[in-house]
Amino acid sequence: MRKFCFLLCLLAGTSEAATYTVKVGQGQVKVEWYADGVVRVVKTPTTAEFVRKSLAVTAAPKEIKVKVKETQDTLFLSDSRIQIAVAKHSGEIVYRMAKRAEIVREASEAVFTSVDDAGRKSWKVKQGFRLEKDEAIYGLGILQNGKMSQRGVNRQLRPGNTEDGVLFFQSEKGYGIYWDNYSPTNISDKGTEVAFSSEVGDAVDYYFIYGGNADGVVSGVRELTGDVPMLPLWSYGFMQSRERYKSQQELLDVLHRYRKDGVPIDCMIQDWQYWGNNYLWNAMEFMSESFPNPKAMIDEVHAQNAKCMISIWSSFGPMTKPYRQLDEKGLLFDIKTWPQSGISHQWPPRQDYPSGVRVYNCYSSEARDIYWENLKRIYDLGMDGWWMDSTEPDHFNWQPADFDRQTGMGSYRSVLCAFPLMTVGGVYDHQRAESDSSRVFILTRSCTFGQQRYGANVWSGDVVSTWDMLRKQVPAGLNFSLTGNPNFNSDLGGFFAGSYNRSWKGKPAYENPAYHELYARWTQQGVFTPMMRSHGADVPRELYYYGKAGEPVYDALLGAIKLRYRLLPYIYSTSWSVSKRRDTFMRALVMDFPTDAKAKSLNDEYMFGRAILATPILNAQYTPEVVRHDADANAGWDKNTGRTQMNAMENVDFSHPSEHTAYLPAGSRWYYFHNGKVYDGGQDVKLEIPFSEIPFFIRGGSILPIGPDVQYSSEKAWDNLEIRVYPGSDAEFTLYEDRGDGYDYEQGKYSEIPMTWNNRTRTLTIHNRRGSFRGMTAEKTFRVTLPDGKHKTVDYNGKKIAIKL
């Protein structure tokens, strides 16, 4: 029997946090409580004090009532939700529910292998967990593997372009595990043992979260790492982008055309190279002669009732001000990054003219200050949002020595996976300190656990434009959401679409029916993501390239955008629930239907909020799916090899309806949104629908507000809404409103209108309004409708009313 001792100690600087330490051999195991059912476990190979401030976890330990019981072999620690059993001889831990049913157990002792980390002694650390053979787990970030359950995954997890590994999973059994390490980390699944193994670490350091169900686990994640701030209302409207607008006039022409054509839009996005050549990379100034007056450009965007977002990077060219400032202080990394060539207009890159671009050390607070000081030049022009590209960051032809660079927080190797968190957090914190008049909005390519607290929407990177990749975006977004971060989106139409150019009659992709179908379906799916943004390379994405009003493809694209705007009261109210109640936008079906085996395994359907069942069309129905077969199909920028000719594709007629089959989860009634037809759950239903119709259902027992037809999100007040009631069970919904921007809501300046539906009495009660804000419309008209078309119109002045239907 190894030497064992038990200590109850209080951590200095905390509020009497309960910490239990078990000495095991030469090392020790420490269990620290953050809430009932939420603990931190730290295992070290020595008894030296392990002191490290988590970058992801912001919560402090709490005093929790813990019952202690000791036997010869085991220490039992119990709170109101779970029991933790620590084996004295090995330090292995078993987690049980309060009623002693086993939740999960560690598979073995922690493994420590001595390694040299840039001249400092450290360890490669590993801990396994014994799972049931058929136990499904979810999370691990944005992975393009098409899977819902991530069992069987064996790979490295780290930030990337099209994939972002997040060191967290949650189980269908209602618990989650966050591995708090920032070095490159592998996850392995040997059938019954799932293990994390990190390249360097002074301890095994992880958090166990018992939530009882998926929502409870997500709530625990946000309790530990921070809640989601409200994003501005405009960020839920439609956004148009491309790689890239080559002048300020081109950007304005697109916006003017949209306003002329009646295409709703809230944001224009400017991609890279507005700064000029690559030696001026990310200068945080408009140096290109094609952008002679950026202030006038932004002012005109605002005059057109739209917002402007701009691309910024984690690296700087050698001729820029921020480069010189950072270089003087030793705050630039010497790693190979994008762009590789200083010549921006030639492809492939001219390696004989290296760009000299270098990544900045975002781990340094001084470097983050310099970053913002330079970015403020653009902020002061009136820029509304930041597109933070390459936040992983890009790192080509890496060598082991690249990771030896010291960051101020340790070696680059030891903190690599925290790069997105640090650089995104730096911009968020600085803008919050600057002003509360507008909300921070960030679009970023990479993510670290806990990043949801920084007002950032993560997109899935430069994905290739294929049907297979479209299908993969659904489980990628759902698993990412199950890590606690609700803000996911992808490039509508995919990013690399060059394989559709010239593959049909030598015509550009925007005349290719195969791309028409893919782009339309991707856009339709994008209605049901937190951010709806059209973007990509090789092919222009603006609607007017795809026909005109009355033609099927154009009508499908425009119809998707218009539907998005009609749903804004529902979406914005859901965003409040995400912020206040720790809710989730894109809800994997396991969250709402955990006992429906078929539903929880589906990777092509999901709930969008609590009412909408999204059943997007993710397969080609009118054109061939396969465009390229060769190895270059996913290689990125368009190459001249391997194109599949599509000249035989004739007489594609999108005016004909198609068939679509959707599964409706058991335990609910379901209403088809477009005609109100009701179906029982637990079955597949086959629909025949026109190309422009997006198939989705409303759950029985839901209240769905429908907004006005608008050209931008704030064009009309929500003073005349349709309130659709879908019977089947009792229902509740809270209509949320505020000014749409700014942080007044943090001081309680917002309104909530609770609504409840009594299914037995068929009565909708609109309760007293709670709260108010500047500019609030005090009186409203609600048209209350049922799926069969029956309706009543009522006036509401903030006082409770009941409507019997």
Give the ranges of each region predicted by the language model.
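Bacterial Sec-dependent N-terminal signal peptides
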Residues: 1-20
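Solvent-exposed beta-strand/loop surfaces of large extracellular or lumenal domains
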Residues: 51-67, 639-647, 672-691, 790-805
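Extended Gly/Ser/Thr-rich low-complexity repeat segments
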Residues: 32-36, 50-60, 85-99, 773-790
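Catalytic-domain carbohydrate-binding cleft regions of carbohydrate-active enzymes
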Residues: 101-686, 690-692, 699
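Short, well-ordered beta-strand segments enriched in hydrophobic/aromatic residues
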Residues: 31, 41, 77-84, 613-616, ...
